[in-house]
């Protein structure tokens, strides 16, 4: 059996694009607020925290939404598991690199913007254009 793969949609046409865009906007706004009120160290620390949350989500979206169609059910499940595993590994690596390589660092800003960026996912159903209809 052949697995159908659709033509690659542009990034802005993905179903998850509004969520990723909202996360990116939130991380930029939080970074600008921190930079303005707490200084440059908190600003770039917040940027690091936001990117630690956002980049793995982009990776997951890229990895998980590659297949479509009923014939590709196994490939879809495998790609979701692989995407989630890669997301966790990437998050751990980015945290390690940030705390090992970025000096000086404001840990509260890193974790604060990280959590704030992840909170956008809780409101993802409000950001999605397509409504699921019940038969």
Swiss-Prot record:
Record keywords: Cell inner membrane, Cell membrane, CF(0), Hydrogen ion transport, Ion transport, Membrane, Transmembrane, Transmembrane helix, Transport
Keyword Transmembrane helix (UniProt): yes
Pfam family, one: ATP-synt_I
Membrane topology: Multi-pass membrane protein
Cysteines joined through disulfide linkages: none
Cellular localization per UniProt: Cell inner membrane
Spans through the membrane: 14-34, 41-61, 82-102, 108-128
Gene Ontology CC: one annotated term: proton-transporting ATP synthase complex
Record InterPro entries: ATP_synth_I (IPR005598)
Family: Belongs to the bacterial AtpI family.
Function: A possible function for this protein is to guide the assembly of the membrane sector of the ATPase enzyme complex.
UniProt-recorded name of the protein: ATP synthase protein I
Source organism per UniProt: Pseudomonas putida (strain ATCC 47054 / DSM 6125 / CFBP 8728 / NCIMB 11950 / KT2440)
